[in-house]
């Protein structure tokens, strides 16, 4: 018969007498951030030819859309994006295409919010601009939208949202205050071969900010 075992635990953690600890993602983040309302939003940034977002430190206006940041999305709002930070959703086009389209319509930077839970690591190797481009989580995107003002057409249809953010040049902390922790994607899970529930307990092990042991002095 085929082996139908689905557990991902290995030896010796799957042994009955072993105490196995699962990993939960940390309920917060540490990094460069911007502030909207009373929340510090820590963003994810990958370095290619794009400048760091912190080079725009200070108060900045932003334009938030519910769309994917396609060329036609930015064209539809005319001059509204000029000199502001563009915020759009992940999906339908590559990350660098979203950022380039936004910059072509006057944006000084692009923030892309995830369309599902989790953090996005983006490839901007094909990006030809130097304007910053970063990503944030889906929940942080919803927070930014919630604290923005809708701009409508003459029929009351929302075209986009606008607001202000304070960009920091320093590291900071954002605490999520979630109702419960989420199991890390890399964590083992069971049952084990003997149908015992493994791991036995869970503790924070993902998204932990700590010293870099490869660098002298941390």
Where are these regions (language model features)?
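Structured lumen-facing ectodomains of secretory-pathway proteins
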Residues: 1-199, 203, 211-213
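Short pre-catalytic strand/loop immediately N-terminal to key active-site residues, enriched for Gly-Thr
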Residues: 214-218
């Amino acid at each position: 018969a085929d082996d139908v075992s689905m557990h991902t635990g290995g030896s010796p953690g799957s042994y009955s007498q072993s105490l196995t600890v699962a990993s939960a993602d940390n309920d917060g983040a540490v990094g460069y951030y911007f502030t909207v309302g009373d929340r510090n939003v820590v963003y994810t940034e990958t370095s290619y030819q794009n400048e760091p977002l912190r080079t725009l430190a200070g108060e900045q206006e932003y334009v938030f859309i519910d769309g994917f940041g396609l060329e036609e999305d930015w064209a539809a709002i005319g001059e509204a994006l000029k000199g502001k930070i563009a915020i759009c959703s992940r999906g339908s086009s590559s990350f660098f295409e979203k950022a380039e389209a936004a910059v072509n319509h006057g944006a000084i930077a692009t923030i892309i919010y995830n369309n599902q839970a989790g953090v996005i690591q983006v490839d901007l190797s094909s990006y030809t601009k130097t304007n910053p481009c970063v990503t944030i989580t889906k929940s942080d995107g919803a927070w930014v939208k919630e604290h923005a003002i809708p701009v409508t057409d003459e029929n009351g249809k929302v075209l986009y949202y606008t607001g202000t953010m304070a960009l920091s040049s320093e590291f900071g902390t954002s605490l999520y205050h979630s109702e419960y922790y989420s199991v890390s994607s890399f964590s083992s899970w069971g049952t084990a071969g003997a149908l015992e529930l493994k791991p036995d307990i869970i503790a924070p092990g993902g998204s932990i900010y700590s010293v870099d042991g490869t660098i002298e002095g941390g």
